[in-house]
């Protein structure tokens, strides 16, 4: 069993299980996303994980996205703490086709995740700082 939280230490096993891996420097993309964001995405639920996160991954794999996405969740702080931050903001996406075939890939183009509500002062300030960044 692969420990997804530390997937970068299990590359051989992931490849053996036909899990598609990022084709870019994950650490650099995440660093740049926090330092100089170019994409803030509001809503970290299933649509992001199944659709928008995959678009970001494809763009990063092609070299067209240099800085990772910052996900701003407004509904539930546990989406951020348990669903994103517990896994270093990475996503294991599994798509099942009608014939039963599974496409599995690690989406690692999310640089940061923030619970953004006024009552969460730390998260709110962080999102404001991202919006004030000239790169955005």
Model-found features: residue ranges?
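Non-transmembrane, aqueous-exposed alpha-helical and coiled segments at domain scale
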Residues: 1-136
């Amino acid at each position: 069993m692969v420990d997804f939280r530390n997937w970068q230490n299990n590359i051989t096993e992931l490849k053996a299980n036909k899990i598609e891996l990022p084709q870019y420097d994950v650490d650099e993309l995440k660093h740049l996303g926090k330092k100089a964001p170019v994409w803030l995405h509001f809503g970290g639920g299933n649509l992001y994980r199944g659709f928008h996160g995959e678009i970001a991954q494809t763009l990063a794999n092609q070299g067209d996205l240099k800085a990772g996405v910052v996900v701003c969740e407004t509904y539930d702080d546990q989406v951020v703490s348990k669903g994103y931050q517990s896994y270093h903001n990475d996503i294991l996406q599994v798509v099942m086709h009608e014939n039963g075939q599974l496409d599995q890939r690690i989406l690692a183009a999310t640089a940061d995740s923030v619970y953004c509500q006024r009552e969460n002062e730390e998260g709110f300030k962080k999102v404001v700082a991202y919006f004030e960044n000239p790169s955005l």
